[in-house]
C-alpha cells in the first residue's frame, strides 16, 4: 500500500525546490493534499479510480465548483508526479472522466473613473505628506497602484518582483508568472515611470537589503495582504461603493485594452495566459460594454419615425 503521507511530503518538497512554486501556491497545495489525505484515512487507502470518484463527490458536497476544480487539479498533478517517479504504475486519473458544472462568471472590473479616483487619492497623499515616513509610504502606495494598472500583473507577481526585475532604463518589468513562466511587460506611460523612479530612488537601500522591489515599513517584502488593505483604505476614504480587489486591476487592464481594439493575442501575452481561451472571457465583458454604448449612444435613438 502506498505511504501517502510520506509521498505527499516528498511531492511538496519537489514543488518547492525543483518547480520553484510560490509560497502562496505551495500553501494551497499543502491544504488540498492534506484534505485528500484525511479523506483517504476513511477508505481502504488505495489510490484508485473508485476512491478518487468518491473523493470528487465528497468535495462537491462541501465546496463550490471552482474550488473543486482547483483541488482536483492539484491532485492530478500529484498523481502525475507519482507515475513519473514510478512510485505507482499508472495514474489513477487515466480514463477517469470528471465534469465541472462551473457557472461562467464574468470578471469584475473597475470603472475607469474609479481608477482615476484611486490614483488621484494616492497622489494627493503624496503631496500632503509632512514626514519622511508619510512620504515614503505614500510614494510606495502610488507606485503599487500605478504598476497594477499599467501592467495587469497579479498581486502575487507584483509582491514577488525582485530588485532587478524593474528596469527603469529600458522601461520594462520582468514578471515570473504561474508555472515559473517569465514574461516582460513594457511600461508606456511617462508618469508611471516617473513615480517608479522616485520610489526606487527613495527606497534604494531597503530594496537592496530585502532583494524585493516593493518593501514594507520594516524594509521587508511587501505582502499581498498589505496591498489589499491599502486599496481598501483608499476605497473606504473616497466613499466608493464597490468592493475592489487587486485582481480587479488586472481584469480592468485587459478589458479596457480590448475596448481600445488591442489584439487579444497581445493581451494574452501581457497577462501571461498559456491558452487564449482563458483570455477570451474578457471579450464577453467588452461585448457587454459595447451593448451599453450602442443602447445609449446609437444615432438611431434620435430618429423619430
Where are the language model's segments positioned?
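Conserved catalytic core of the tyrosine transesterase superfamily
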Residues: 1-305
